[in-house]
A protein has these predicted regions:
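Periplasmic-binding protein-like
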Residues: 49-59
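Short beta-strand elements in bilobed, periplasmic/extracellular small-molecule ligand-binding domains
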Residues: 16-32, 183-186
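Glycine/small-residue-rich loop that forms an oxyanion/phosphate-binding "nest" at active or ligand-binding sites
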Residues: 62-108, 112-116
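Short, ordered loop/turn segments at secondary-structure junctions
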Residues: 1-4, 31-33, 57-62, 81, ...
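Short, well-structured alpha-helical segments in soluble
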Residues: 36-48
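Glycine-rich phosphate/diphosphate-binding loop of Rossmann-like nucleotide-binding domains
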Residues: 2-14, 103-238
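Generic secondary-structure signature for well-ordered alpha-helical cores
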Residues: 20, 24, 46-49, 78-85, ...
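Glycine-rich loop at the start of a catalytic domain that most often binds anionic cofactors/ligands
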Residues: 11-16, 41-44, 67, 74-76
Length: 239
């Protein structure tokens, strides 16, 4: 913990409560000066008594807008060893997520990659919604097998995600794009578009991204709202 953000402190308290309920030893290490966070993480990575690390963000915040991310917080995420990263935010896990790789040890496939929990929970909620995912794709997901890019969601699924944080918006966009949705990733300064997992130039406005509706179709809307992200999924069904 290297900030005074009330939401981060509350999240840390909830994390501790959940860990204690499951019999997991939980310790908060407070860093007074953010400049010492990297050293503290390196020490935790090397500590044999530490099996998992959670960093409570924001620490430095975003420097400038870039889809790849350019903030010091991004650097801090990559300082956490993948062997201790329980949030799936380090470079290795992010890279595997964007390439739709589910295991750390292919082709043996014994060690599963860790996915960001909030983004994954949204996907699981959508799997439970009718007429969104192919049933065989859900079965493959439950077995931790990655379906081919673009073949999990049913045709003509459009998703608009208002938020592009490294914790929620960005990984969620990648997951749903890999599953076959046309995804519009909206942040304060830009809009990105994914088609079948491929990043493309977006010419639509925010309003057009949210209102991707054709008059000849009946739309089902699923709204999943958090304080830091809004996902709007539209599923086109013939009238």
């Amino acid at each position: 913990m290297a900030n005074n953000d009330p939401a981060a402190k509350q999240y840390a308290e909830w994390t501790g409560r959940a860990c204690r309920a499951d019999g997991i030893r939980y310790e908060i290490r407070t860093i007074d000066d953010p400049i010492h966070v990297e050293l503290a993480l390196q020490q935790a990575n090397d500590d044999p008594k530490v099996h998992g690390i959670i960093v409570y963000y924001p620490i430095f915040g975003q420097d400038k807008e870039s889809y790849s991310g350019t903030s010091q917080d991004d650097y801090i995420r990559d300082t956490v060893s993948f062997q201790c990263d329980v949030e799936g935010l380090c470079h290795l896990y992010r890279s595997n997520l964007y390439r739709n790789v589910r295991y750390l040890d292919p082709p043996h496939n014994h060690i599963k990659c860790i996915l960001p929990c909030t983004a994954l929970s949204v996907v699981k909620l959508l799997e439970a919604c009718p007429n969104v995912y192919h049933s065989q794709a859900i079965m493959a997901t439950n077995r931790q097998q990655a379906s081919p890019v673009g073949l999990s969601l049913k045709n003509d699924t459009h998703v608009t995600i208002i938020n592009r944080s490294e914790i929620v918006g960005r990984p969620l966009a990648a997951m749903l794009a890999n599953d076959g949705a046309t995804v519009y990733s909206i942040d304060l300064h830009s809009i990105y578009k994914f088609v079948n997992g491929t990043l493309q130039t977006c010419t639509e406005t925010v309003e057009e991204c949210v209102l991707k509706v054709r008059n000849s179709f009946l739309m089902h809307y699923y709204y999943i709202v958090r304080t830091d992200a809004v996902l709007i999924l539209t599923k086109r069904i013939a009238a």
